[in-house]
Amino acid sequence: MRSECPECSNDLLDMVYDYESVRWKWDAEFAKRPFNMWRYRELLPVRDISNRVTMGEGGTSLFRAHNVGMMLGLRHLYVKDERQSPTGSFKDRQASLAISVLREMGVTEAVLASTGNVAISYSAYSTHAGIKLWAFLPSMVPGEKMREIALYGTEVIKVTGTYDQAKQVARDFVVSRGLHYDRGFKSIAARESMKTLGFEVAEQLADLLGPSEKAPLQVPDWYFQAVSGGMGAVGVWKAFLEMKEMGLVDRLPKLASIQVSGCAPMVNSFHRGLEVAEPVLNPQTLVSTISTGNPGAAYPYLRSVVLEHGGAFVKVADEEAFRAMHVMAKMDGISMEPASAVAFAGLFKMVSQGQIQPDDVIIVNCSGHTFPVEKFLLGDDWERSVEVAGESGTAPELHEEGLLASLENLDQRTNRIAIMEDNLDSARLLRRVLQAQGEYQIDEAHDGREGLEMVRKNPPDLILLDLMMPEVDGFGVIDALKADERLQDIPVIVVTAQELTTSEKRRLDGQVHRLLQKGTFLSTDIMEDIDDILS
């Protein structure tokens, strides 16, 4: 495969296909094939399918993040779950196609530089294909990932320096040994592989939401991805361009490229109006897998996409990414690596800034799994030990008095919170937020009359109150609380779906400590208010 144009020597080449022929095959043959990335083989740069190196990559699920969507006020928030890939990251798509091309070219030994996930994927697939691999890794890559790479038999070279410095050392090694070097973003196979993610999303959305008005497949309004070198976002964008060329979709999405603040050359350069990215020479981030200081040719391409079609370049702090990790795991059961969480943190930020509309269809690439969990993400108090063995090694007898005393002590140190909410989904969400963030005794009522009876029987430390309820609404509940000496000092957080008038806000004065708009707060926002009130 050529590495540069024979006429102009440009080393950023692109693939063009017979789209008319592929369009016919898409209708006639693609649907009969297994749902994986090789379903779209006519749009991939492998001439002979027998050279394919596959381990079941692609065909990952697309599902709705129901709880987080409710929390953010988004009706159509979907997660593309690339954690299901053979090595746990979307880079398996890249490895499968790139190693297939190497096999077709007769390459038996190759070199790459990586911040972690690419090296893991390439190590697995090169071993599967019988190709020897050398991986040059910057020293910031966690030791766990380096050991996993070595487990596959890859020669691991740890470079004391940045990722860009590791790439230079790798290139020097290639020159001295005459080996094949994976060119990253400039590799045709690497970029083309990421198209398959976009193809799958369009098919899956059509199944979930129905086809577009003028085309058989469906397009999201926004596609979110954490970017380092930008290859994934570029590949997905090309997928939508090709589908539009073939009449499979009738519009294009907006791309949201999210980076960490400590290494955000694309975001910084875009907001400064630069046409070429200004490199970050010394990345300062714990999210090492997306610490490319110099994104090269990907930035001008993505910049032109955003300027022409809309979209965003957004940066988030490491802490915002770790916060998003906790929110996604505790609210929707989705555990992910920090790099994936960067994309979700970017979504949270854009929602809070009013850039995303409630009816927008959102796809977030959950690009990889977090296993093992990095120690710094949980801190020191993530577990509690319980001794159950007696002197002889058997379990001690539990006396009723001791057990009751323990339960009483538990009640004494656990705050009681009452939820009054008639919408069952909203009540479930509030309960889930509380359960995920701390130890609380939770009482729940679904109308104002029932709620007042509940708090009179067991006065809580705090009330989470919806205003629009049957029987007695939230305003009536507030009036009743104020009139009862036992209840008038209980703090209240009002969670409402509508904007309140000035007179309505006056009715809430005194007892209400905070007013939260449904769909505009994160779980951590409400927990900060709860912690402040209870402390």
Predicted regions located by residue number:
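Helix N-cap/capping motif at the beta->alpha junctions
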Residues: 444-453, 474
